[in-house]
Amino acid sequence: MDTRPIGVFDSGLGGLTAVRQLRRVLPGEDIVYFGDTGRVPYGSRGRDIIVQYARQDIRFLLQQDVKFIIAACGTVSSTYPPEEAARLPVPFTGVVGATARAAVDATRNRKIGIIGTAATVRSGSYAAIIRDMMPDVQIFARACPMFVPLVENGYFNDGNPVTKLIIAEYLQELKDAGVDTLILGCTHYPLLKKMIGDFMGDEVHLVDSGKVTAQAAAAALDELGLLNGKKTGGTARYFVSDTPDNFDELAHTFLGEYAGGTVERIAIETY
């Protein structure tokens, strides 16, 4: 039994979709969340900058005495060196491994689509893991750099004409290719899931990286003996790197409920 909190971070607020799922499967666990809202998005930046930001995010969470760290960010998960993750003093997981496995389990025609930030797609991390498990798979990857800004700025309401147009622009090629499974390779993308599903069609299975990762993290915490033993009453503390004004309203969108915890701005560059 371990009463320390779970640490979760993302480039912005998208990682709250993973927190939402984590609270569903582990309602008694305490959570510390950091959203780097002052430097979002990470996906358009170079590898060295992404790794630098990830190191700062991780150092901050370690100072909060967390017992387990979840990089609820496809860009970091695809870029942060695994050898560094292995040297951290607490277990670390990203979103790529569990999500890739879920896609392999779901596909019927062995045609898998991957959408994510430019950095995530460029890394080839999803494709490499999927091909290890399913060598004869056909993979169709597409960077969707506008999706994170659209979500962070509230353009995710069902039927928004601007968002629908951009979804069609990005995903038509994958639809034409006949993918039957599509990885939502960024934790912001579940906010667009309804519109993406409407465009791709009911026959295409959408793999939510935040949901899959939360389930995998819960299993890992249990296996490692790190759960706190509580069934209810988990608390949450939220930290951001930009002004926290209207955080509760924005967080409600990602969590499906009001945050119900404290939110504090920090100077992440000092970590």
Regions found by a protein language model. Name each.
Residues 1-271:
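Non-catalytic structural scaffold of enzyme domains
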